[in-house]
Amino acid sequence: MRECISIHVGQAGVQIGNACWELYCLEHGIQPDGQMPSDKTVGGGDDSFNTFFSETGAGKHVPRAVFVDLEPTVVDEVRTGTYRQLFHPEQLITGKEDAANNYARGHYTIGKEIVDLVLDRIRKLADQCTGLQGFLIFHSFGGGTGSGFTSLLMERLSVDYGKKSKLEFAVYPAPQVSTAVVEPYNSILTTHTTLEHSDCAFMVDNEAIYDICRRNLDIERPTYTNLNRLIGQIVSSITASLRFDGALNVDLTEFQTNLVPYPRIHFPLVTYAPVISAEKAYHEQLSVAEITNACFEPANQMVKVDPRHGKYMACCMLYRGDVVPKDVNAAIATIKTKRTIQFVDWCPTGFKVGINYQPPTVVPGGDLAKVQRAVCMLSNTTAIAEAWARLDHKFDLMYAKRAFVHWYVGEGMEEGEFSEAREDLAALEKDYEEVGMDSGDGEGEGAEEY
């Protein structure tokens, strides 16, 4: 088997985890207590879902997941929620005091105390796997636990499981809406530390998702539940190929092979379509061409950047539902001809397609309409550098005055770590710039030398 272990860190990671596992259970016909009614064997005995669930002797399906937070309130909601019986109590790990939005607390002082317990639990999950293929790590960049503890955990996972893939789903601090003043510090410190340990990182920007909820789903004031259910759909699309038999089965390593041209350039942009409310869907049926087109609308992206300013290096289209290759090829051909999509000149083909015949499932009482087909596009574009530039600028404004730095130094960090992290991100921006250059101008060798 090709199992994946999901690790949900901090408030954002745990709440996205709730949305994802709720959706996985619905997709696979698993009840909140982990039982799978025998009459509901989906698709006549397709056991691909075992990549995400392990089965106990009593016939209960348990998620291969760990929920970690340095303070208990958010995980307590899982412990008392609808899905409390789904998880083994030891999978839900909490500390006593939180990281207080401070990377240094998550990475050094508070995180250190809990990391061995977490690794021990992950080891137990890994031992149940016959062929572990990697880890999916869910966290935010802005929080103290999400940034600090995640980077600590990634470093330790690299030591213990060197060859296994590690994919991140990270919540990027929204340009306008902020939950903490020190988000830019935490984001840059965590990006610097995890850059060499992460194989592929899908970023999600709260503000972009707010806008999608407001515009496409007509929700006036979206709550985190609305946002997380949408993120859950996206994560589900990305992992569907691991959990169902598809025509073109994509596994974790295959993502990287096709999306990551250089080790550091591993931040694909995620776009999902159709995001549509039930009232609207009632009146329209979306064709493959329409949803494919929608993927190239900046409005449907999960991070606010403008791909028209960048160049594409690779594109992965993951379709699910009633989709045939003929329609997909036609849709992509049309896009190639009429769209203003620029590919870098050293990567001419650039489209990889995966199809899963399982149509998207929706959460009952949720906001999304039930649709026949959906697509999730993962594209590696140089435009994502805009997101880094934005963050770096905010970092610079604060760091020039050394604002808030004493909180980090007080927890045992050195000021040098800030400048080191900042330099690494400057290098990352430069890497993106070089990758986007045509092979003709300058020395095309720049990107290969790290």
Swiss-Prot record:
It holds the Pfam family Tubulin_C. GO terms for molecular function: GTP binding; hydrolase activity; metal ion binding; myosin binding; structural constituent of cytoskeleton. It is found in: Cytoplasm, Cytoskeleton. The modification N6-acetyllysine is found at K40. GO terms for cellular component: cytoplasm; microtubule; perinuclear region of cytoplasm. GO terms for biological process: microtubule cytoskeleton organization; mitotic cell cycle; sperm axoneme assembly; spermatogenesis. Transmembrane segments: none annotated. It comes from the Eukaryota. The active site is at E254. The record marks Y450 as: Involved in polymerization. Mg(2+) binds at E71. GTP binds at Q11, E71, S140, G144, T145, T179, N206, N228. Its cofactor is Mg(2+). Its EC number is 3.6.5.-. Undergoes a tyrosination/detyrosination cycle, the cyclic removal and re-addition of a C-terminal tyrosine residue by the enzymes tubulin tyrosine carboxypeptidase (TTCP) and tubulin tyrosine ligase (TTL), respectively. Keywords: Acetylation, Cytoplasm, Cytoskeleton, GTP-binding, Hydrolase, Magnesium, Metal-binding, Microtubule, Nucleotide-binding. It catalyses: GTP + H2O = GDP + phosphate + H(+). PANTHER family: TUBULIN (PTHR11588). Tubulin is the major constituent of microtubules, a cylinder consisting of laterally associated linear protofilaments composed of alpha- and beta-tubulin heterodimers. Microtubules grow by the addition of GTP-tubulin dimers to the microtubule end, where a stabilizing cap forms. Below the cap, tubulin dimers are in GDP-bound state, owing to GTPase activity of alpha-tubulin. Dimer of alpha and beta chains. A typical microtubule is a hollow water-filled tube with an outer diameter of 25 nm and an inner diameter of 15 nM. Alpha-beta heterodimers associate head-to-tail to form protofilaments running lengthwise along the microtubule wall with the beta-tubulin subunit facing the microtubule plus end conferring a structural polarity. Microtubules usually have 13 protofilaments but different protofilament numbers can be found in some organisms and specialized cells. Belongs to the tubulin family. This is Tubulin alpha-3 chain. It comes from Drosophila melanogaster. The lineage of its organism: Eukaryota, Metazoa, Ecdysozoa, Arthropoda, Hexapoda. The gene is alphaTub84D.
